[in-house]
Amino acid sequence: MKKEKSQSLICLTRLYFSYLFQKATIIVFSISLILILGIVILISNPFYNNPDYLYNANEIHTLFLSQSLFVIQLFNSIIITTVALSLTINSNSFDSLFLSHTSRLKICISKLLACMFVLIFLNIYEVLLLVLVPLIRYPLYKISNQTILYFIYLYISTITETITSFLISTAIPIIIAPMIFMFLSIVIKLLSNNFTLFKDFASKIIPIINVNEKGITLDSLMVIPIWIILFSLLYLSIYYVKDLKQ
């Protein structure tokens, strides 16, 4: 019985992939990935002055990482909103196929799993850019022993934003809801990038990645798992109650 349930969940997850990756979603993903690559290459400054680089190599490496992470997180907000919009638009058509013979909890978990796998591959791609672009561009650049932290912190940030967007999209099932959340998320990131006081405050409660010459940090690392669990449970609860009313 356990094996059959496991296969059923895998099947649902695969089916949701087909709903998630439709033409509009694929276009947004493709354009975003290409733009991220192009902008990260530009941030590496192909026209830098070599003598200046030799004197300020560490500062240039830190600046590259900081600016690249900022751009990556902005594009992640757009990608997450696209996924949330797909969730809102395709929810009824996908759910109606299985509600009569499949638990709502299993349907909901399959959606989360599908999105989590997508985000894993997205963040792997982004971390590869953060490592390979400077490795190719900068003669003195060495792969940091914190590289694994790039992925962990990026994934924590991305999954937190995704679950929050899912929660909002499920509680307020209108197209404009995830778009408003995207706007607020981008505004917070812009303010954090430009105002130190705001960043110091916000980074204590939401996943804002900090970069300096000492390395990369995530001040809210102890708080974020609580938010992820809480928002996941709220999302599951709202989804379950909402379906019961239909």
Name the predicted role of every residue range:
Residues 19, 114, 186:
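Active-site micro-motifs of SAM-dependent methyltransferase domains
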Residues 26, 32-84, 109-179, 213-220:
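Secretory targeting signals
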Residues 14-21, 59-68, 90-103, 167-181:
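Hydrophobic alpha-helical transmembrane segments
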Residues 83-116:
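Helix-loop-helix units of permease transmembrane domains in multi-pass membrane transporters
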Residues 6, 39-64, 178-246:
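Terminal transmembrane helical anchor/hairpin motif
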